[in-house]
Amino acid sequence: MSGDTGTTSVAPPPGETEPGHGVRIVVEYCEPCGFEATYLELASAVKEQYPGIEIESRLGGTGAFEIEINGQLVFSKLENGGFPYEKDLIEAIRRASNGEPLEKITNSRPPCVIL
């Protein structure tokens, strides 16, 4: 089609669901700590990969950045001391959407970088 601009969304074939459908993510983070920007960045990356996924944010305690997938804690900044890598979270979502068992994300990037 000439003159057609923008992106087109293609629905999955009948009987198939959109990747990430049925997966629910809850991110609990410390707003006074300035972690909202990290949450928004991570949520944007997840939505880009899985447009139909449900992501809920909650305000958490001091230093918190905790991620649950379908009610299971998969990442804790309080335990790891950093933030999750996007690729690790995307992989956990892929596993959840395929019905595979979830493992805790133990890799983390430092909360800040000193130049």
UniProtKB/Swiss-Prot annotation:
Modification N-acetylserine, positions: 2
SUPFAM superfamilies attached to this UniProt entry: Thioredoxin-like (SSF52833)
Disulfide links within the chain: 30-33
Gene giving rise to this polypeptide: MIEN1
Proregion positions: 113-115
Region annotated Disordered, chain positions: 1-22
Subcellular locations according to the entry: Cytoplasm, Cytosol; Cell membrane
InterPro entries: Selenoprotein_Rdx-typ (IPR011893), SelW_related (IPR051441), Thioredoxin-like_sf (IPR036249)
Presence of keyword Membrane: yes
Function: Increases cell migration by inducing filopodia formation at the leading edge of migrating cells. Plays a role in regulation of apoptosis, possibly through control of CASP3. May be involved in a redox-related process.
PTM notes: Isoprenylation facilitates association with the plasma membrane and enhances the migratory phenotype of cells by inducing increased filopodia formation.
Nucleotidyltransferase recorded as keyword: no
GO BP annotations, alphabetical order: apoptotic process; negative regulation of apoptotic process; positive regulation of cell migration; positive regulation of filopodium assembly
GO cellular component: a single term: cytoplasmic side of plasma membrane
Biased composition (Polar residues): 1-10
Predominant place of localization: cytoplasm
Membrane topology, record value: Lipid-anchor
Self-association and partners: Interacts with GPX1.
Name of the protein this chain belongs to: Migration and invasion enhancer 1
Positions of S-geranylgeranyl cysteine lipidation: 112
Alphabetic keyword roster: Acetylation, Apoptosis, Cell membrane, Cytoplasm, Disulfide bond, Lipoprotein, Membrane, Prenylation, Redox-active center
Upper classification of the organism: Eukaryota, Metazoa, Chordata, Craniata, Vertebrata
Pfam families xref list: Rdx
